């Protein structure tokens, strides 16, 4: 079973949903040109919110826009949606000032049901983690506003999105254990 992003609800669904994401959409004006996908083994993948990354499709998996994929992360793997393939990816990488000399992580596979299960479990605990993180920040008198939490697709790592007027010394904050 293949999955893709269902943008009516913002969730993921089986491939074949007809709704399109207009937000942060990269229009692939070369999509209908034969051989476009073979020109580059790089793909652009979007994660929660506006976070995007570039990955090498070294296994030559047939990918198209909207496919949900498992990609390499440190540690483990993450789940994201393919937003661009083919010749335009290197141009987007250049536009985003992506350092091509750095080691580029790779696409592992199209997401499997077990990947989606772990992803949904991780996504389900994001709100509770955000609330707990806000409580901890308040208890530590950290002048910051935590706006969102994003767990990696396998649940091994979390990204905390916050705003602050000044630099936040978060060393004591990072050593605390949040709910899992």
Tell where the protein language model's regions lie, with residue ranges.
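Short, intrinsically disordered, charge-balanced linker/junction segments flanking boundaries
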Residues: 168-173
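Helix N-cap motif at beta-to-alpha junctions
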Residues: 163-167
